[in-house]
């Protein structure tokens, strides 16, 4: 398998991921179907971690394996994205506290916010039980936090 370059880049503590809107992402009017914003936000969170130096596979296959579940997701849709739009998913990991991480995200077009999301992701053991973040996760994520962290 060939390693591809990490998608996106950091701008301060924010990770920016470019996303193109394809025909498959839209409804019959050419507007992005609402559920696809959730997919874009997920890509932003995953590529944030990858750009910070750790992927989901690294976390699951480490000596202290873990995974994530979304415990809360609040989305505010502001304006529609349309077919062929070049979007940016902005992701900021705010706080790590206990088993939870607060992540704030936005989808933008030409600097204009189209949607915002507040996500609470929880760390779990591979059997689904809640757990605190691993040392590996803390080592990679804490430098990028924009808010206080109980794990520091």
Which residues make up each language-model segment?
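Core beta-strand residues in small-molecule sensory/regulatory alpha/beta domains
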Residues: 78, 106-108
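Generic short beta-strand
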Residues: 104-106, 121
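Hot-dog-fold acyl-thioester-processing enzymes
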Residues: 2-70, 126-152
């Amino acid at each position: 398998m060939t390693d591809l370059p990490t998608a996106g880049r950091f701008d301060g503590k924010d990770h920016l991921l470019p996303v193109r809107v394809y025909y498959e992402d839209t409804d019959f009017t050419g507007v992005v179907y609402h559920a696809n914003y959730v997919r874009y936000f997920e890509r932003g969170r995953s590529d944030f971690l990858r750009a910070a130096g750790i992927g989901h596979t690294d976390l699951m296959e480490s000596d202290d394996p873990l995974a994530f579940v979304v415990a809360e997701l609040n989305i505010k849709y502001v304006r529609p994205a349309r077919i062929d739009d070049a979007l940016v998913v902005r992701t900021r990991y705010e706080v790590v506290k206990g088993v939870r991480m607060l992540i704030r995200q936005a989808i933008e077009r030409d600097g204009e916010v189209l949607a915002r999301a507040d996500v609470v992701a929880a760390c779990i053991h591979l059997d689904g039980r809640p757990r605190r973040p691993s040392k590996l996760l803390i080592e990679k994520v804490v430098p990028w936090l924009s808010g206080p962290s109980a794990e520091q």
